[in-house]
Amino acid sequence: MKPLAIASWNINSVRLRVELVSRFLKLADPDIMCLQETKCTDEKLPLENFKKLGYKYAAFKGEKSYNGVLILSKQKILNVEKFNFCGKDDARHIGIELEDGIKVHNLYIPAGGDLPDTKLNPKFEHKISFL
């Protein structure tokens, strides 16, 4: 089995940073790129930009203005799983399986806010429930 290079980046809006991501992909040349907080719907992902760089395969779960996860791959993706946690469909977790059986999961875990108390802070409660 040949080595597999995986990179991960909380991009905080893939459309605003498509040129930065493209530059990184050219320099680092990972086999798989996981992006979190893409902040756009599936149909607005700039996938053509990444296909030109050799990332012919993609799995994604987008959400307008919030969250969103994207996996770009040079290798063929056989299976895609989209997960929901805590009863919310908030585009935070996607998993793929490659031809050689390797599975890759991309998660965007909630920040949880400033107050680490599940009773007083609903965002922190969501983070703890997610984990």
Task: Write out the residue ranges for each language-model feature.
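Short amphipathic alpha-helices and their capping/turn segments at secondary-structure boundaries
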Residues: 23-25, 92-100, 129-131
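Generic low-complexity, intrinsically disordered sequence content enriched
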Residues: 29, 75-76, 128
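Surface-exposed cleft-lining segments at the edges of enzyme active sites
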Residues: 109-131
